[in-house]
Amino acid sequence: MAVSKEDILGAIADMSVMDLVELIEAMEEKFGVTAAAAVAAAPAAAGGDAAAAEEQTEFDVVLSSFGDKKVGVIKAVREVTGLGLKEAKELVESAPAPVKEGATKDEAEEIKKKIEEAGGTAELK
């Protein structure tokens, strides 16, 4: 018997955030694709260089490593993401991993600072 789309959607709806991250990574590997949103290329206007010179407004905070203070980094990740202990631990152990995506510059820098104060290393993308 084939699995229906509704069954798949129901199973996905019941997954935790970390399970979804693992599912996406497995699908990327299996099918050789990325989960990045497709962006349509717009024709360049007369001031095309001006758009390239605009400052980035959204940042992704990526945990590079947790160093030798894993417990402190897990606490910092829980504080900034609101994840449960298990999910935060899985996120930290899967480094490099995104902690926060689409954050403002100030928010991203604050999250990076908290992770680094806890003993981990993070970068902004």
UniProtKB/Swiss-Prot annotation:
Protein name (record): Large ribosomal subunit protein bL12
Compositional bias (Basic and acidic residues): 102-117
GO cellular component, one term: cytosolic large ribosomal subunit
Residue segments, region Disordered: 96-125
Quaternary assembly: Homodimer. Part of the ribosomal stalk of the 50S ribosomal subunit. Forms a multimeric L10(L12)X complex, where L10 forms an elongated spine to which 2 to 4 L12 dimers bind in a sequential fashion. Binds GTP-bound translation factors.
PANTHER family: 39S RIBOSOMAL PROTEIN L12 (PTHR45987), LARGE RIBOSOMAL SUBUNIT PROTEIN BL12M (PTHR45987:SF4)
Known role: Forms part of the ribosomal stalk which helps the ribosome interact with GTP-bound translation factors. Is thus essential for accurate translation.
Coiled coil: none
Keyword list, A-Z: Ribonucleoprotein, Ribosomal protein
Gene Ontology terms, MF aspect: mRNA binding; structural constituent of ribosome
Family, per entry: Belongs to the bacterial ribosomal protein bL12 family.
Naturally occurring in which organism (per UniProt): Alcanivorax borkumensis (strain ATCC 700651 / DSM 11573 / NCIMB 13689 / SK2)
GO terms under biological process: translation
Keyword Ribosomal protein: yes
One Pfam match: Ribosomal_L12
InterPro entries the UniProt entry points to: Ribosomal_bL12 (IPR000206), Ribosomal_bL12_C (IPR013823), Ribosomal_bL12_C/ClpS-like (IPR014719), Ribosomal_bL12_oligo (IPR008932), Ribosomal_bL12_oligo_N_sf (IPR036235)
